[in-house]
Amino acid sequence: MIFLMDRIELGTQSLKEYRNFAEENEEVQATENTDVLVDKLKSTSPSDTLIVTSIQKMSNIKDDAQNKLNPNDIALINAKRLVFIVDECHRSTFGDMMQTIKHTFPKALFFGFTGTPIQGENQKKMSTTATVFGNELHRYSIADGIRDHNVLGFDPYKVLTFKDSDLRKAVALEKAKAYSVDEALADPQKSKVFYKYLNLPMAGGKDALGEEIKGIEDYIPNTQYEGEEHQKAVVEDICENWQTQSRNSKFHAIFATSSIPEAIQYYKRFREAAPWLKVTALFDPNIDNNGKGITKEEGLKEIVEDYNARYGQDFSIPTFAKMKKDIAARLAHKSPYQRIERTPEKQLDLLIVVDQMLTGFDSKWINTLYLDKMLQYENLIQAFSRTNRLFGDDKQFGTIKYYRRPHTMEKNIADAVKEYSGDKPFGLFVDKLDKNVEKLNALYVEIKDLFVSAGIEEFSQIPADMAERKKFADLFQSFNENLEAAKVQGFEWDKPIVIINEDTDEKTELHADFDERTFKVLALRYKELFTPNPDGSENDPDDDVPYAVNSYLTTIDTA
């Protein structure tokens, strides 16, 4: 059985996972190169029956002259019952390498696993995942995983760096061939064109006949988002909200940009605007043979030197692949950085990428994805999913903030969710701040009524009745979970929550019905549920009630 990966880092990650799941009498073999792979495929040893390798090594078997693989060797391997398990099979299964593997091993069975299969709407080379692997055998969608609490939901935000009204006017004036609104309105023909574009939706879509229609953002050139004004606004938004969003840098984030030059520009902007932020960048280190190659090489050299200086490393451009592994381990808190959270100065706050690390990379310490990049379908869901690994109460969801053509991205998100949730998106996105505060107020009323009905004022003690104690434990857990979510979304004590209506720009203030002091009193009462009686006596075992205890909650600061 061959577990087939399409990248080295995915193979390394998967090898560890497979070895963790293997039985005591099973061995999962790695393949350092094509020679080792061939030897293990030819081997009759029981220890060589489970192999993890890359699609590149497997496709090289037939044509790699160094291996001198003759027809007898291929026949020997083909005489075995071969099963290929292709992980992340939405990625590199539509190219020549997969075809080479299938032609080399025509009797093998191929099973593809992916959370984002390529389908009709986003087909590649007029093919879908079903074209390559056959009809779908089973579906467990991302929405199923979220509802089963195997992964977290998402909290997406579109961030506008330009006013919609300004973009509408700019496009309308350009199409009307007018320099000002006065000029456009003075000419009937120009006025007609001006108002036509002024009334277009921001994002394009399809009309009743299924024909594509453009929106305002379709007319915005890429250069609009490559300039200083946009980039500075993005950097400012990330930095201003960093402490809250990262839980004081406990969690890390990935920032995906649209090109390598932009990744370098953003790196420099972050270094200038926020020298306290531990940031680096990761992209293809191969130097281009065009006019931009020098700029890329200079930028890459600066990034590597900064990384070495901050973390005491000795990487270079030729050893950039090793630096990538170090970055991945640092972000995931894996060997040699298993307990890096105890030494924050060694952590990495923000990783800037173009395409890398947006598929397959797993770290529960990633809680936010920033996007100055357009994504669709499988690429969008895969990138979002870097943020939704389970952690604890500090991480209730994965946050997504997108800045480029935000209205179009909002539509892309809706399309991708429909495609990959089985058209059942319920639970995929978490409640926004206003809904969380409404829930908090409702839960607070329930808790308050519980204490009042028990004859207790000002939450001065826990109820004596065990059923009431259990109900309080359940209510407070829900209360705290919603509060943690609200804090990440911007909730602050003693400050009103301002909700802005996207369509009308109307502002509404929403207030919490409780303050920080009240919360700390409730947290203290909750802790008392699990402490000995004041006289030192133990609780009567017959009075024990099976609480849904969350150990994190019992360590809340009540000072």
Segments from the language model and where they lie:
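Interdomain helical connector at the RecA1-RecA2 junction of SF1/SF2 helicase-like NTPases
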Residues: 123-250, 267-272
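Inter-Walker segment of RecA-like/P-loop motor cores
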Residues: 20-66
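Catalytic cores and motor modules of nucleic-acid processing enzymes
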Residues: 12, 210, 242-246, 258-287, ...
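Conserved Walker A/P-loop ATP-binding site and its immediately adjacent core
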Residues: 1-20, 257-263
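Conserved segment of the helicase C-terminal RecA-like domain
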Residues: 386-418
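Conserved helix-turn-beta segment of the N-terminal RecA-like "Helicase ATP-binding" lobe
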Residues: 8-35, 272-276
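Conserved C-terminal RecA-like helicase domain
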Residues: 49, 201-353, 511-514, 518-533, ...
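Conserved RecA-like ASCE ATPase "motif II neighborhood" in helicase/translocase motors
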Residues: 50-86, 91-100, 334, 353-355
